[in-house]
Amino acid sequence: MTHPLQGISSMATRQVLADLAAAWQAQGGAAVAIESVGGVDAARRVHAGEEALDVVFLASDAIDRLQAAGRVAAGSKVDLVRSSTVAAVRAGAPHPDIGTGDALRAAVLAAPSIGYSTGPSGVALQALFARWGIADEVKQRTVQAPPGVPVGTLIARGEVALGFQQRSELIHVEGIDILGPLPADIAIDTVFSGGVVAGTPHADTVRRLLAFMASPDAAGAKRRQGMEPA
């Protein structure tokens, strides 16, 4: 191929995909250029079908919707990584107890401001608040990070006191302390998948790329970026 494969992804997988693409190319695979943007924007652009894209990486349910719409080739979806949602505070701030569901609920109720993302973790967090019966109580204190901006950035700036997002989005943000994952009974985990964009002339190459990214050889890179193989 004379031109790199063109890909698009959500921000949550930006670093792990860069590492996996580099490993793929190091063992002789085709060059890959992946643009990472907010997941909602990425899905919208693939759905619009106006760009010459070859591969898309998004949350599993987003890939399913694109496949149902005919924008991702049928049967091409490959689950790649599982990412856990964690809680974080500004570096040096007191660490609230989040070890149980009741403790986390109390921490949320006590926080003067709460940050969450536009991605799947944010959607799941809002659903959790609704199940707890506190959605209305905390509504005025919740802040949604702009698309493509890590919640950790808002935490580090002091714009929110308690934030939630994928671990992979927060581990490289300076100025925050990660408290840890949510308790097992209310864990918010997201599977990210890849798919062949319908109409690409490089479908076979993309399938080989996705097979490599799902292989045991890719597990180490995933764990280094705070994720687990799917």
Residue ranges and their predicted role:
Residues 1-35, 40-49, 57-69, 74, ...:
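Exported/periplasmic ABC-transporter solute-binding proteins
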